[in-house]
Amino acid sequence: MAKSIAAKEYEKENQLLKEEIERKTGKTTEQLYEEREQRVRDAIECKKPPDRIPLATHPDTQAYTGVPNSAGYYDPIAFKRAMRTITLDLEPDMANAGLPMSGVALAALDVKNRLWPGGPLPPDYDMQFVEGEWMKGDEYDLFLSDPADFVVRYYWPRMYGAMAPLAKLPPIGNLFQGFEGITPMLASPEFIKMAKLIAKAGRATEKFRKTIGDSSEELAELGFPALSHLGAGGIGGAPFDVVSSFLRGMQGSMIDMFRRPEKLLQACDMILERRIAHAIPADPKKRGNPKRSGMPLWRGDKSFMSQKQFDKFYWPGLKKAMQATIDLGFVAFPFFEAEFGDRLERLLELPKGKVIASIEYVDAVRAKDILKGHTCLYVRIPLSSKVWSFNEVEKFTKDLIDKCGKGGGIMLDVRLPDRGTKEGYQKLMNSIREYGRY
């Protein structure tokens, strides 16, 4: 895929920055990369403490650089420059390149389950998921008997407004012959309109990808390992979350635990089996030692299900997904997005040093007591810190280090206030960095 002119210009900037970093530090960017990767690796393996606690950070791009969040959907080069500026200024041990995607493509497809900045939302907002009942309670058998047919004729027409005509197709599994019989339907105005919208989305996505390139690799070339190796392979998270958030919706999946438990479990099993069957092993030739496979998790929270329900519907699928990810050569990186509490004990059933438990609302001290010496903690500073002062963030983080930092096996994601100067951000990160030395 040929690179755009803007992408080529960005590449030249990266080369100049690389040379500047090497002059400033007296080290190659490859050496700096490995120093940070070693620090992260030591924390993950839980064998010995690293030289200091590894740090990541996620300041608001608009607050720090003046580039709105909408750039991640409509101005990829500006977004990449913003993420690069944040990385070079704050020097995290794991860099975040963001999750940019084409807003033009999303709009053309009329996506129903997402709202994004610069599109349905103001430019400075964060992307939002919109849950819906994309699969009805009486459609489990349709999904289980022929998932491909269900996706094409039921799921896509509901999830993407542009693809609504697909609901008029006959069952795809029956079209062994006689495809020509449905060509009049495909030639109708509504199908032609759909094809044009898909083509528009395809062109926009291709252009966006050419421009955005491999942002994580470009930051790695400047000496910064990726937080998570997106697109590298792995299995994904808990299959229950797939059913709950992308098929039945929260309400539907909660009802199904009582009214259709066996169908719900069958769907979870099928989703996981298909994911495992198509999973790609870690590529030893690519960066990442170890490679980290992210897994966002949410419905296993104590407020969504009881311990008994967790043991029946959630943990078996999640455990299999994490073990399969580990078997493929990755470190499983589950993001426990809510209050999982003592349910983290189940991570002790997995191999030592092969999981990073990302927590935010869980008591970090209790989590460290449960997992110390076995599973690395990735502790995210609370979202409320966006409105804290620099002093409050610094005090909270240093107190966390005092209580949980001993013996290694911990990394910190320092969420920074939305208001402040660049000098203030850098001073705060430097202070936390030095305080976290062993």
Please state what every model-predicted region is.
Residues 1-438:
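Catalytic cores of TIM-barrel enzymes
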